Design a protein with these regions (language model features):
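Extended, helix-rich architectural segments
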Residues: 1-357, 362
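Extended, charged amphipathic alpha-helical segments
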Residues: 326-464
């Protein structure tokens, strides 16, 4: 299928193929090449990835009050000459102030996590507890008489904690009643947030939303449990979408610059000879695509010891095929088969084919500038909504609230024209103040000493 994202179409491999084809590395390599063609190809222009990276870099400089002053100098230069100007070209930090106000205003957590068990067992316990408390309310006199005569307490809760009526009981159930499973669930969720430093992660996410208009995080599940990682939108790629929450994207990717020892740790099966060849090809790709204006200079040693790897997720579907066989006793037995299973349509056969399609996610790792696919496999621990187990959620959570027709707008992007006008006005005021300053007076001390006052004395510099 051809996915058109600009003037030139990008050819992605068809998804209407068998599961065996999708799991092959050739299919994964085709997906990798298509993504590289769509985002990193400079033949049709600057490339989507590089255009996005440069624009985000420009907005971040404005948000820090460190934007380029070249445009301001061009406004004041006369035929490119600035020698007659003595101005303070440092940008006025207008935008950083408002960015801090907006970001800090989004940091308050106004709500706490509250778990409410709805399973039949928990619901039964809650109902039984309410009935027991209601019984204590209705039999307060009898319970007190039993305590006085027999010295035995038959209450379900202490008398001081007993609600006075049904209204107080309802309020108590909302505020004071908690089952152990609910407390454990709340503690587990809070522990996930705490271990992943969620407040710092959220602040970076909100900062990107304000400055760039888009924010992204990635969730994974490994031996350390649930992990939430920050994703730089400048390194993020995605399939075309008009949804501000990116829920209909069928692929996401993240570009990472990793060292050779980290690559060897992630993929220990790569031979050292192949690793050396990858380094040479990868460094050439970096030298060609490096933006020396917007990126810190990278030494030749760094180029020879790092690789640019694209980690991506690809959403497709798989067919769960079962052979339903009728046994001699009349019962049915389900046997798992691959999607190539296609029995003949013969009523004399006592079995049939039953299939169900469900979404899956494939994980891949591709070295940019080469044809090397480091990883291509079906993801494990995929996230599925409890209401629809046939649907899968991507590992990336992305939001761009002000996106329209694929174009992302941020608060800072709307403020940059006004920041430029304020900066030009500031420079013009400096120029006007310099013109209003009177010219200095030069006093020739030697000439004053030669002035004859007519009384036998000469004029001196101290008297002047």
């Amino acid at each position: 299928m051809a996915i058109t994202t600009g003037q030139f179409p990008t050819q992605f491999p068809s998804q209407a193929v068998s599961d065996e084809v999708k799991t092959s590395r050739d299919y994964g390599l085709s997906v990798s090449r298509a993504i590289e063609q769509e985002w990193f190809n400079r033949d049709n222009g600057a490339g989507m990835y590089f255009q996005t990276r440069d624009e985000f870099h420009r907005l971040r400089l404005y948000a820090r009050g460190e934007q380029s002053i070249r445009k301001y100098k061009d406004e004041f230069a006369v035929n490119g000459d600035l020698s007659y100007l003595n101005l303070d070209w440092k940008p006025v930090p207008i935008i950083p102030k408002f960015v801090d106000i907006v970001v800090n205003g989004m940091q308050d957590r106004l709500f706490d996590i509250t778990a409410f068990a709805q399973d039949p067992i928990s619901t039964g316990k809650r109902t039984k507890f309410v009935n027991d408390i209601q019984r204590d309310i209705n039999a307060q006199g009898l319970l007190k008489q039993i305590e006085n005569q027999l010295g035995v307490s038959a209450r379900n809760v202490p008398e001081e904690d007993l609600p006075a009526n049904s209204e107080e009981l309802e309020l108590y159930m909302q505020l004071g009643y908690k089952q152990g499973i609910e407390i454990a669930e709340e503690q587990a969720i809070n522990n996930v947030f705490l271990s992943n430093k969620f407040p710092q992660l959220k602040k970076r996410f909100d900062y990107d939303l304000t400055v760039l208009g888009i924010g992204a995080v990635k969730n994974t599940f490994n031996t350390d449990g649930i992990k939430l990682d920050y994703v730089d939108p400048a390194n993020l790629i995605w399939s075309y979408t008009e949804d501000p929450n990116f829920e209909d994207c069928y692929y996401f990717g993240e570009v990472k610059r990793i060292s050779l020892n980290e690559l060897k740790k992630q993929f220990p099966a790569i031979p050292d000879e192949e690793l050396f060849e990858l380094t040479k090809k990868g460094s050439n790709w970096v030298d060609y695509n490096q933006d020396w204006r917007n990126s810190s200079s990278t030494s030749e040693m760094d180029n020879n010891n790092t690789l640019t790897v694209l980690y991506f997720n690809w959403k497709t579907w798989e067919n769960n095929v079962y052979k339903i066989k009728e046994t001699s006793t009349g019962a049915s037995r389900a046997i798992a088969k691959d999607d190539n299973f296609n029995p003949p349509q013969d009523k004399r056969n006592r079995f049939e084919r039953v299939a169900q399609a469900r979404e899956v996610v494939y994980e891949g790792a591709f070295v940019l500038g080469t044809d090397t696919l480091l990883k291509w496999k079906k993801a494990t621990n995929m996230i599925r909504p409890s209401s629809n187990t046939n649907k899968v959620l991507m590992n990336y959570t992305v939001s761009a609230p002000r996106m329209y027709k694929g174009n992302i707008t941020s608060l800072v992007s709307k403020m940059t024209p006004y920041a430029d006008l304020i900066q030009l006005t500031h420079l013009k005021l400096q120029q006007a103040i310099q013109r209003m300053t009177p010219s200095g007076v030069f006093i020739d001390a030697d000439g004053l000493a030669e002035v004859d006052l007519g009384n036998g004395t000469n004029y001196n510099a101290q008297e002047a």
